[in-house]
């Protein structure tokens, strides 16, 4: 077996049971990985030098095909209502078949790190069948120094073989696609999908399981730091503005997607970004756009024209087009991947019902309530003439990646908020003056002005009113922001329609939260929205 590249000889790929391979490439850099990718016909080059790969039928994650091994260790610690179990025997069989399937193949190994905090990191080895997957994950995770690679010992191993097709009957799975996670042995097997995001989220899932036991809060969020060292954390589901609002030229970007919060403050789990590129433009998002125009970036499912120019407006392969690049491709990114204790937490929502105010201040109990709710609203497809928005509740703002019960994360968050006296804000980037189809999108200028006032501390001195539906505190006046926008009811022409819409949304919150009622105390239960009669 031919082995190339810097690695710890005492911790070679054979320690994972992989044998009789034709070649193993360890820790290759971008140029070598480009060569191998092109040689194998796995991807194309854009005119600017980015590597452009297509993932075939899977253009997103496959949450229904993800399984967690249910054993003596995980039995009482995993939230089985939300995680599909796999028996240890089925996993063992799958693992043996992966090893058999890999025989005679060339494999690529990247020895990487998840977690910028030395006390809370995991050494994650990622073994891939595709060369472009090796570059992708190298861009996304933290890269050890050349010296460190010589003594690197993996604590977690991910084996990604897209050509492996799972037999549902043999392993008790759903389809030919499988993502099997053994949290006890820290092994992840990915088969039957070429979507690269599965690898990144597997490391996130492992850290989300390991860290709470150490009192460290894992978060699906972006984070940045102001010139005075004040750290801000942005929670939010897809499409709420997490990446856009945390990319602020006046602040240092710590990371855009996954972080931990421990005794030393906030730290990035990753060393790169995985940004959406559909309708990306140099005008709207210059820093992200610039990363797509250079060597080293991986473009996923982006359409190229005949001159190899990327067309970011073309969603014919998927709306979920992406780019993966190292964090240092962003000019104002943090070099350490670390920030201090957060001063502000922002929970983003895009309320398409037009009910929520553009900003509200939350108590620690309200913050836990809204964190467990994880609300946003998707806008229905207009092609069928459906204008009714759809409420989405994804607990902890990232349910698919949270192996433990949400209340564990919620209680940890509440404890840290109280301990460090963090200001918490709910920011609505959705609709104002009516629901989607009637009202208009919240002006980004207003959102940025409100956010700036929250982050610089001046918003704490504003006069607040209590929202009659949600019970949180809403500023009455903020310099540079039209006052009417701060009171959503006043922006609706039809006040009766507003009250009906508010009641509808409150009822959705209440019924969604029923499953958490037995896991929270009275203070959090009392933070639930309730209809209080609004004055005309």
From Swiss-Prot:
PROSITE patterns: PEPCK_ATP (PS00532). GO terms for cellular component: cytosol. Substrate binds at residues 61, 195, 201, 322. The keyword 4Fe-4S does not apply. It is an enzyme of class 4 (lyase). Gene3D superfamilies: 3.90.228.20, Phosphoenolpyruvate Carboxykinase, domain 1 (3.40.449.10), Phosphoenolpyruvate Carboxykinase, domain 2 (2.170.8.10). It catalyses: oxaloacetate + ATP = phosphoenolpyruvate + ADP + CO2. Its main location: cytoplasm. InterPro entries: PEP_carboxykinase_ATP, PEP_carboxykinase_C, PEP_carboxykinase_N, PEPCK_ATP_CS. It is found in: Cytoplasm. Its cofactor is Mn(2+). Its EC number is 4.1.1.49. GO terms for biological process: gluconeogenesis. Keywords: ATP-binding, Cytoplasm, Decarboxylase, Gluconeogenesis, Lyase, Manganese, Metal-binding, Nucleotide-binding. ATP binds at residues 201, 220, 236-244, 285, 322, 447. Pathway: Carbohydrate biosynthesis; gluconeogenesis. Involved in the gluconeogenesis. Catalyzes the conversion of oxaloacetate (OAA) to phosphoenolpyruvate (PEP) through direct phosphoryl transfer between the nucleoside triphosphate and OAA. Belongs to the phosphoenolpyruvate carboxykinase (ATP) family. This is Phosphoenolpyruvate carboxykinase (ATP). It comes from Brucella suis biovar 1 (strain 1330). The lineage of its organism: Bacteria, Pseudomonadati, Pseudomonadota, Alphaproteobacteria, Hyphomicrobiales.
């Amino acid at each position: 077996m031919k082995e190339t590249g810097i690695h710890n000889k005492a911790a070679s790929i054979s320690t994972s049971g992989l044998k009789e391979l034709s070649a193993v490439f360890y820790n290759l850099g971008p140029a070598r990985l480009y060569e191998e990718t092109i040689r194998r016909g796995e991807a194309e080059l854009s005119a600017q030098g980015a590597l452009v790969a297509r993932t075939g039928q899977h253009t997103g994650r496959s949450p229904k095909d993800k399984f967690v091994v249910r054993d003596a260790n995980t039995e009482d610690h995993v939230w089985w209502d939300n995680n599909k179990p796999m028996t240890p025997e089925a996993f063992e069989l799958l693992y043996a078949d992966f090893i058999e399937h890999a025989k005679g193949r060339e494999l690529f190994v990247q020895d990487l790190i998840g977690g910028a905090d030395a006390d809370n990191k995991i050494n994650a080895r990622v073994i891939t069948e595709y060369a472009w997957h090796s570059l992708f994950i190298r861009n996304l995770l933290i890269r050890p120094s050349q010296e460190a690679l010589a003594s690197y010992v993996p604590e977690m191993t991910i084996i990604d073989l897209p050509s492996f097709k799972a037999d549902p009957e043999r392993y008790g799975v759903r389809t030919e696609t499988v993502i099997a996670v053994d949290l006890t042995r820290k092994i992840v097997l990915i088969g039957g999908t070429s979507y690269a995001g599965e690898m990144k989220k597997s490391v996130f899932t492992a850290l989300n399981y390991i860290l709470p036991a150490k009192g460290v809060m894992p978060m699906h969020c972006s984070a940045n730091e102001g010139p005075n060292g004040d750290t801000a954390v942005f929670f939010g589901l897809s499409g709420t503005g997490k990446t856009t609002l945390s990319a602020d030229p006046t602040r240092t970007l710590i990371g855009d997607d996954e972080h931990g919060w421990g005794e030393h403050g906030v730290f990035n789990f990753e060393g790169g970004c995985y940004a959406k590129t559909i309708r990306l433009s140099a005008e709207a998002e210059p820093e992200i756009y610039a990363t797509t125009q250079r060597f080293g970036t991986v473009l996923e499912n982006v359409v190229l024209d005949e001159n190899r120019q990327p067309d970011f407006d073309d969603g014919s392969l998927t709306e979920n087009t992406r780019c993966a690049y190292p964090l240092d491709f962003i000019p104002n990114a943090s070099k350490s991947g670390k920030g201090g204790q957060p001063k502000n937490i922002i929970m983003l929502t895009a309320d398409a019902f037009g009910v929520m105010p553009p900003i509200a201040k939350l108590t620690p109990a309200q913050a836990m309530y809204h964190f467990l709710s994880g609300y946003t609203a998707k806008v229905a497809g207009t092609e069928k003439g459906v204008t009714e928005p759809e409420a989405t509740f994804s607990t902890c703002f990232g349910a698919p990646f949270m192996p433990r019960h949400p209340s564990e994360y919620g209680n940890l968050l509440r404890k840290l908020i109280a301990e460090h006296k963090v200001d918490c804000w709910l920011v609505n980037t959705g609709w104002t003056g009516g629901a989607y189809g009637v009202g208009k999108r919240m002006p980004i200028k207003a959102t940025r002005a409100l956010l700036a006032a929250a982050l610089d501390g001046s918003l704490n001195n504003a006069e607040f009113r209590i929202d009659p539906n949600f019970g949180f505190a809403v500023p009455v006046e903020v310099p540079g922001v039209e006052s009417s926008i701060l009171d959503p009811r006043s922006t609706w022409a039809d006040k009766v329609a507003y009250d009906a819409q508010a009641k509808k949304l409150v009822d959705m919150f209440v019924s969604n939260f029923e499953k958490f009622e037995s896991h929270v105390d009275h203070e959090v239960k009392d933070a639930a929205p309730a209809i209080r009669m609004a004055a005309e």
